[in-house]
Amino acid sequence: MTKSNYSANNITVLKGLEAVRKRPGMYIGSTGPDGLHHLVYEVVDNCIDEAMAGFCDKILVVLEPNDIVRVEDNGRGIPVDIHPTEKISALELVLTRLHAGGKFDKGSYKVSGGLHGVGVSVVNALSVWMEAKVYKDGFEHYAKFEKGSILEPVKKIGETEKSGTVIRWAVDPSIFTETTVYNFEVLATRLRELAFLNSKISITMRDERLSTPKEVTFAFEGGISQFVSYLNESKQVFPKSPVFIEGEKNDILCEVAIQYNDGYNENLLSFVNDINTREGGTHLEGFKTALTRVMNDFLKKYPKLVKKMDKEEKLTGEDVRAGLTAIVSVKVPEPQFEGQTKTKLGNSDVRGIVDSFVNEKLTLFFEQNPNEVEKVLEKCVAEAAARIAARRAKEATRRKSGLDSFGLPGKLADCSLKDPESCEVYIVEGDSAGGSAKKGRDSKTQAILPLWGKMLNVEKTRLDKVVNNEKLQPIIATLGTGIGKDFNIEKLRYHKVIIMADADVDGSHIRTLLLTFFFRYMPQVIEKGHVYLAMPPLYKISHNKKEWYVYNDDERDSVLDQIGRGNNAAVQRYKGLGEMDGTQLWETTMDPARRKMMRVTLPDAVEADRIFSTLMGEEVEPRRKFIEENAVYANLDV
């Protein structure tokens, strides 16, 4: 691996650490589960910085008992010598001062994903204690900290041939009051992503909290090409292997991997220095522009396909990205982030660099693989035809109704209040359950939309079919946001969208189909926390004129034990919502003071995309494998 003289001279100090414990949310976003896991990412980001600089190829993350985390790498080791101006050990400086780190010295790090020094010092400030071991220059060094302050100054504790850094800590439960328990799968998802983005490293994660420790290693020599294959694993794809494009100009490294599948949804991920740029930015704009241009240029070479297009009609960006899985990853020395969550790249020069590389390399690939380009163009042209058909249908509806969109559906029992924040809509399967819900609701704030007809699996369907589906059309009209590129979250008519289906296998299937629709066509409704699942009771238990509604088998057994097994309690299992009258439905499922609901969240869009594709796609084997591996976590009818 690369060698470099990395010492205290490379550490630059910007300001102190005082405010972190007082206002932790300013530094890690929240003190809930997201913030807790963010601490691990901050420490791992330092290891990744070492890897991107060429000094580290192995990272270990260990979850120990008692909510302790240990992160190790085999990099150069954080400097331990005395800083020339601060007159303390560089290790102490990095871990106790905000904005102290090698990232700010261009000689030490060309590009940086995490905030080297910033991240670790914040973790230190929010921990009850932290230990640091550094293997460097033939010696093992040790220091201990308490709530961000030095407790045991840096000292040599032995000789070693190793190099690297070990950071071990226990978070402060007085700050993380919601939970201090780490979720293995949440961490594994991010570590897997980092391993895909950095093909020369391996990341091992071990859970020592279990009686039999669980260990998984992520190492992907294929890098982002392998990432695309992973995302497409349950789909029929072309070309067989993803197209990989890379290039470097003005110290900006660009990598792109693309592959089409037989679906209709685009899955476009972009990263800057390993940071997921969820809001996109100039690198993504450059990619999209080049892709659309290349496709239109090649279309001219296929007259039979041109004939299928309307005159003067060109392929749009939406046409060429339907069924596309692509990853755009750039490494930028000084990224400028914009947007609401600072996850949008603003560097204008990156747009042209990505555009140029994609245009040149994709053109070359298509020239060398004419069969592949014809397959792709056939798909793009079919998508254009569907888009034009959907547009004409929408225009016809508009002329006919005099409305900008579909009118509100006839079966919708709307609420009287018009303030979206106070209103909720129950999407209910079947007219009988819809009737009970209408009778039991609070008509001031609760709207009821009964669904009828065949539910569509949007994972296998084009936009024009989705827009015209008899079951989805009323949902689109009721929510008021529009879908696809017309979507506007500000027009959402209800801030709680509650899916209410039977507590059986058919109900689970309907819930999954509806969630797939929201994820594919209205993802912001989920991201903003507006989608909920109603939790109707599974059993009603009656005894001595008393009634209990219970929601699972464990609760049923607990109530029966409480009554006494020999006391002839009557147990009714609800097969469907229609078996309850309006009063029962209100008391058990709709009364805000008593009901149980589950909010649908989207902590990781990448993994959610893969799971929806696996569960709702055409391929049977990946679905079977997923269900077998995850049966312990869900009640599935296999």
UniProtKB/Swiss-Prot annotation:
Q: Where in the cell is it found?
A: Cytoplasm
Q: Which residues bind Mg(2+) 2?
A: D502, D504
PROSITE patterns cross-referenced by the UniProt entry: TOPOISOMERASE_II, TOPRIM
Q: Which UniProt keywords apply?
A: Antibiotic resistance, ATP-binding, Cytoplasm, DNA-binding, Isomerase, Magnesium, Metal-binding, Nucleotide-binding, Topoisomerase
Its quaternary organisation is:
Heterotetramer, composed of two GyrA and two GyrB chains. In the heterotetramer, GyrA contains the active site tyrosine that forms a transient covalent intermediate with DNA, while GyrB binds cofactors and catalyzes ATP hydrolysis.
- Any idea which positions bind Mg(2+) 1? E429, D502
Q: Which PANTHER family does the protein's record reference?
A: DNA GYRASE SUBUNIT B, MITOCHONDRIAL (PTHR45866:SF1), DNA GYRASE/TOPOISOMERASE SUBUNIT B (PTHR45866)
A single MF term (Gene Ontology): ATP binding
The free-text cofactor remark is:
Binds two Mg(2+) per subunit. The magnesium ions form salt bridges with both the protein and the DNA. Can also accept other divalent metal cations, such as Mn(2+) or Ca(2+).
Instruction: Quote the protein name from its UniProt record.
Output: DNA gyrase subunit B
Q: Which family does it belong to?
A: Belongs to the type II topoisomerase GyrB family.
